Amino acid sequence: DGNEISGEIYFVLSGPTEWESQWHKSLKPGKSFITVPAAVSVVNEGFEKAVVEMTKYRRKIRRPNKDNEKLAVIFNDYMNCLFGDSTTEKLLPLIDAAADAGCEYFCIDCGWYTDTNWWAGVGEWKPSAQRYPGGIEKPIKYIREKGMIPGLWLEIETVGFDCPNIDKIPKSWFFRRHGKIVSDQCRYQLDFRNPEVQDYATSVIDRMVNEYGVGYIKMDYNINSGIGTEVDSD
């Protein structure tokens, strides 16, 4: 939250609070709760220097990860390219170009699972036969033949209004508030506390890896489910 008052500016990053982060914890008498660690940067050189010091701190506490040491070169077919309208015919020349450019990963973005509206059609996560005659395995296999790791886009936490099996999904799978299923932008938010939802997510990942041959998954998150669910809440 950034605000300017009387020629001065202050910048606040909040943690687990109800006002800024839609989070709260009710404590019974005698009970306590330890919040997440907080960091404060104090400098004399101004805002930019303060941000520099905070960035140094974040880099220092970041867990060791080889992917952070050598970032891979990834080609994604969405932005300034196919925008969720991929087909085998459109992908093959892009795969060639990405390989020639030295890319290590090639990711097929949204839309691979529907013939129509990629946004509201999320949830079942099965390839469109119309977009990929002979199966999505064909372009995925070609990506590997060109020396790259194939990837698919996924938003596992959402189910769209136009999902083919939306009427078969139990209401208990979703966030609910005021007795109604929470929705945002033609999508519903799954509740991953539910073991059935966990099993569903696992089955989707297993299918993408073991059946389609995917070696990379781009996890996206595009909706705002608000303050969460009232089901079994504190």
Residue ranges and their predicted role:
Residues 110, 128, 141-143, 196-234:
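Active-site and adjacent substrate-binding regions of carbohydrate-active enzymes
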Residues 30, 75, 98, 106, ...:
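Conserved, mostly hydrophobic/aromatic
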Residues 1-63:
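N-terminal accessory beta-strand-rich subdomains and adjacent acidic, glycine-rich linkers
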Residues 35, 71-77, 104-108, 150-154, ...:
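Hydrophobic faces of well-ordered beta-strands that scaffold small-molecule active sites
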Residues 70-72, 81-85, 129, 149-151, ...:
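Active-site-adjacent "subsite" loops/lids of carbohydrate-active enzymes
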